[in-house]
């Protein structure tokens, strides 16, 4: 395992252990990084994602392309401290899309204050979500060149991510036709069952009601994205558990909503992703393990079919954060180790550099919707 100490090692990577003989010489070498931030508060996750997205967009053009898959299991319980870990006893927060207003989405600001719920404005579009140990977050930060066969827009990115990253049942039949031995997708890599689908810009539970002769559509995952010249970010919040009473106390039924919602109340519109998962996925951590396996097969397939690019799938373990360093290690081409100083450098470079002046869009908000300092809410942090 290599230790990453500076920004260049991520954004302009050198690969000393690469066997060039195994790669066609005319192929450009790229890296897709996997980072698990399950012990982070969502606020720091969003700051990290925004920093990686903007820095990648500005610094990797014409050089090695890089990308990131970032996961956060907010359901994970942490009852004790190990080393320098921060323990978040209160991760409750409402996250608003970049254009959303508190008055249009928050039902009762007094309830927010009394229950010590933090308010966050994120750097991407989309709707408003409530996080309280109830969601599995998956983010993709990728160069536009990652997808060679079609142009990705905000209007089609959910369809693309569904078909490319998540529709594993379809890919079993499509990809193994090319090379069964090198591309051995099997049932161990299936993430979802037949009820998982997409509709408009959401991931949904889709079924047919035989009695009433109508299609049932319930939201199981919300998506948001941001596009820049060279990169896009697409993140998903999968609903693991639904506390409808708490949602009703906090979130309004928004005036701007997808057509298929049809003004349904939260309890009639939102559904746990668990109804859409393959039979052997019982926990968010198992989902993450399956996702890692599946992404590795996606990269293998991409390397077989892409004549110009070769992608490595590497993991960045965060020192004192990722306890199980060797978990799923066989699915990564390489594993790096980094400490919080590196993340702090990444954020500070983005937050303070003149290259990104006034670009930052992720902030804490007060009850009136005004931007406040990163220390406004009393939560422990890793790199702020």
Curated annotation (Swiss-Prot):
BPL/LPL catalytic domain span: 79-303
Subcellular location: Mitochondrion; Plastid, Apicoplast
Gene Ontology cellular-component annotations: apicoplast; mitochondrion
Any Gene Ontology biological process: protein modification process
Pfam families, per database record: LplA-B_cat
Effect of residue 93 to A: No effect on lipoylation of BCKDH-E2/BCDH and KDH in the presence of LipL1
Predominant cellular place of this UniProt entry's protein: mitochondrion
Keyword flag Membrane: no
Keywords: Apicoplast, Mitochondrion, Plastid, Transit peptide
A molecular function (GO) term: lipoate-protein ligase activity
Top-rank lineage group of the source organism: Eukaryota
Ranges that cross the membrane: none
Purpose of the protein: In the mitochondrion and together with LipL1, involved in the lipoylation of the E2 component of the branched chain alpha-ketoacid dehydrogenase complex BCKDH-E2/BCDH and the E2 component of the alpha -ketoglutarate dehydrogenase complex KDH. LipL1 is responsible for catalysing the activation of lipoate, forming lipoyl-AMP while LipL2 is required but is not capable of catalyzing this reaction. Although its role is unclear, it may catalyze the transfer of lipoyl groups from lipoyl-AMP to BCDH and KDH or act as an effector protein.
Name of the protein: Inactive lipoate--protein ligase 2
Species per Swiss-Prot/TrEMBL record: Plasmodium falciparum (isolate 3D7)
């Amino acid at each position: 395992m290599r230790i990453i100490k500076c920004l260049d090692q991520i954004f302009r990577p050198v690969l000393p252990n690469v066997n060039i003989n195994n790669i066609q010489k005319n192929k450009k070498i790229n890296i897709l990084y996997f980072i698990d931030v399950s012990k982070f508060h969502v606020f720091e996750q969003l700051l990290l994602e925004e920093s990686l997205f903007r820095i990648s967009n500005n610094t990797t053009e014409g050089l090695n392309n890089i990308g990131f898959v970032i996961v956060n299991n907010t359901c994970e319980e942490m009852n004790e401290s190990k080393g320098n870990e921060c323990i978040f006893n209160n991760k409750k927060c409402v996250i608003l899309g970049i254009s959303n207003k508190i008055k249009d989405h928050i039902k009762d600001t007094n309830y927010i204050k009394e229950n010590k719920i933090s308010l966050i404005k994120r750097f991407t579009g989309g709707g408003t979500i409530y996080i309280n140990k109830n969601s599995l977050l998956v983010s993709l930060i990728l160069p536009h060149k990652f997808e060679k066969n079609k142009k990705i827009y905000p209007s089609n990115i959910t369809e693309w991510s569904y078909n490319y990253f998540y529709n594993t049942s379809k890919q079993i039949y499509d990809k193994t036709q090319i090379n069964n031995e090198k591309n051995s997708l099997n049932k161990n890599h299936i993430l979802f069952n037949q009820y998982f689908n997409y509709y408009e810009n959401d991931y949904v539970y889709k079924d047919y009601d035989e009695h009433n002769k109508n299609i049932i559509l319930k939201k199981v995952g919300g998506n948001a994205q941001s596009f820049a010249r060279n990169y896009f970010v697409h993140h998903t919040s999968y609903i693991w558990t639904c506390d409808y009473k708490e949602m009703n106390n906090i979130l309004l039924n928004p005036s701007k909503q997808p057509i298929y919602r049809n003004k349904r109340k939260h309890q009639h519109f939102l559904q746990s992703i668990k109804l859409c998962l393959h039979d052997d996925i019982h926990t968010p951590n198992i989902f993450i393990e399956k996702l890692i396996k599946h992404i590795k097969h996606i990269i293998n397939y991409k390397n077989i079919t892409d004549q110009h690019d070769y992608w490595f799938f590497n993991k960045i373990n965060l020192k004192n954060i990722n306890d199980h360093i060797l978990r799923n290690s066989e699915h990564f081409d390489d594993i790096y180790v980094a400490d919080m100083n590196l993340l702090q450098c990444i954020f500070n470079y983005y937050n303070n550099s003149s290259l990104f002046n006034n670009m930052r869009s992720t902030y804490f908000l007060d009850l009136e919707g005004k931007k406040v300092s990163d220390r406004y809410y009393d939560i422990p942090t890793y790199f702020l």
